[in-house]
Structures are given as C-alpha cells and as structure tokens.
C-alpha cells in the first residue's frame, strides 16, 4: 500500500505487515521517468530513494534496463544462505525481462551489536555501506539487500522494503524462527522473505503496477488475498513461520504473474 507521498520518510505498520517509504535526499528529486532532469541534455538520472514499487517497471521490463544486479551486505555472523539467494534469482529470472540477473557475492560488514534497528538507522547503514546505485544512461538497474544482526523495532517483522531498490532483513529474527525442532530451515524462510520483499519493489498488488484482476487484500495494503501466494500479508511476520508455514516456498501466484507479465 502506498501510504505516504511527502518529502519525509515514513513508516507504516498494518496488522503486523510493514512497508517503509523513503524519499530522495536531493534538493532536486528525480526518478526513472524523468527524461532530462538537469535540462542540459544529459542522460536521465535515477532516484534510488523513492518509495517501494516506484521502479517496478524498470525492474520488470527491458525497455530501460536490460540487466539487474543485486548487492548483498550482511553483518558478521548473519550471512544469507546461498540456496536462499539462488531461489530468489530463479524466481526473478522467470518473471523479469532481463538478459542478465546477477546476485553478487555477499559482503560482510561490521556487526553493530544492536538488539533492534530503527528505520533511520537502516537508512544510515545503507548510506555507509552500499557501494552500487543505478546510474542514468546505464543498462543496469541495481538493487540492495542489507541483513542486520538484530531485530526491527517491531520484533515480529522479518523483512521490509524501504526504498524502491532497497530491502532489509533481520538476521536475529530469522535465526530465532529457524533450524530448531519443528521449525523451518533458514534457507526456506530466507527464500520466502526475499521473494516477498522484492515483490513489493516489483509493484505487486497495486503497489506500482496495475492489477489485471483484483486480488488485493485491502485490509492489509499491498498484499494478496491468496494465502498460497508469496505476497500474502502474514509472510512478513514471525507468526506465519511459526504457525502456518509448511516448508513450501510460495510463488507469486496466478494473478501476480499476470500483473508482471503485462509490464514486460
């Protein structure tokens, strides 16, 4: 759900499902649709601090960018599983019109040692550690994953999309809900949450691209009514993985697939 369009970053929590919306810190915000933001005939600029879903078409089609690269940073001790990242790549390759999708080798960054992280702290960490952003005139759109060594201030949240190309995941929360007796594997939880949060930045469920058929759970914003779809609202929370998840990594569903195909 697109709740905020102010020049201030804002946080919305709807029934435990969280989306964080950011804005440009530039005095002249620009976006992927700006033909000539500088007015001097130079290549279009790209705003990597827009709201989740704002760059959905740039991800889905090859009209502006033919390649996707994902930068992955993780705090020491919380490296994401390769199988979880491979599962995400396979899903993106099925749905995105890109000649190449590359997930870079995860890079370790210093653990901060904080038990929780606020929205502002997450943005600050990205400013410090993110190496690659999308450049105007390039064939490559860059996305960013940040895996933290603590929890979000709302401890039930597993991951979030907080800018149009940026997603964060809470390593300590994932650790607590995986690997134990009767708990799912870390790989399957990561694979599921990676898809879900990337789905927000693909504009799914009326969060940047139109629905071909109505499947929005309006009570929970940009989430699907189908509880077998990876965009089901509860997937962002620990309760889902503790009580509902059967180990099957959900796909984007028939309706979500239709929505993405219409943009290719």
What are these language model-derived features?
Residues 2, 132-136, 220-223:
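A general structural signal for short secondary-structure junctions and capping/turn motifs
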Residues 181-256:
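The catalytic-center signature of Zn2+-dependent metalloproteases
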Residues 64, 137, 163, 224-225:
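A short, structural micro-pattern
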Residues 133-209:
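Active-site-proximal segment of zinc-dependent metalloprotease catalytic domains
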Residues 27-151, 261:
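Propeptide-to-catalytic entry region of secreted or membrane-anchored zinc metalloproteases
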Residues 1-11:
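Bacterial N-terminal signal peptides that target proteins for export
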Residues 168, 172, 250-264:
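Short, cationic low-complexity segments
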Residues 19-22:
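C-terminal motif of bacterial Sec signal peptides marking the signal peptidase cleavage site
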């Amino acid at each position: 759900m697109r709740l905020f369009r102010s020049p201030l970053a804002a946080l919305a929590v709807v029934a435990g499902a969280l989306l964080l919306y950011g804005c440009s810190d530039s005095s002249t915000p620009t976006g992927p649709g700006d033909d000539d933001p500088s007015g001097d005939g130079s290549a279009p600029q790209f705003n990597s601090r827009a709201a989740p879903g704002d760059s959905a078409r740039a991800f889905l089609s090859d009209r502006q960018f033919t390649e996707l690269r994902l930068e992955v940073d993780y705090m020491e001790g919380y490296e994401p599983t390769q199988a979880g990242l491979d599962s995400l790549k396979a899903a993106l390759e099925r749905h995105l019109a890109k000649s190449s999708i590359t997930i870079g080798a995860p890079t370790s960054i210093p653990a901060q040692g904080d038990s929780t992280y606020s929205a502002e702290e997450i943005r600050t960490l990205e400013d410090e550690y993110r190496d690659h952003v999308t450049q105007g005139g390039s064939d490559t759109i860059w996305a960013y994953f940040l895996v933290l060594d603590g929890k979000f201030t709302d401890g039930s949240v597993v991951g979030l999309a907080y800018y149009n190309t940026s997603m964060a995941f809470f390593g300590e929360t994932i650790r607590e809900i995986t690997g134990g007796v009767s708990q799912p594997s870390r790989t399957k939880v990561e694979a599921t949450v990676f898809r879900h949060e990337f789905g927000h930045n693909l504009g799914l469920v009326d969060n940047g691209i139109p629905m071909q058929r109505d499947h929005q759970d309006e009570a929970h914003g940009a989430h699907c009514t189908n509880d077998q779809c990876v965009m089901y609202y509860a997937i962002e929370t620990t309760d889902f993985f503790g009580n509902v998840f059967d180990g099957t990594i959900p796909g984007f569903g028939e309706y979500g697939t239709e929505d993405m195909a219409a943009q290719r």
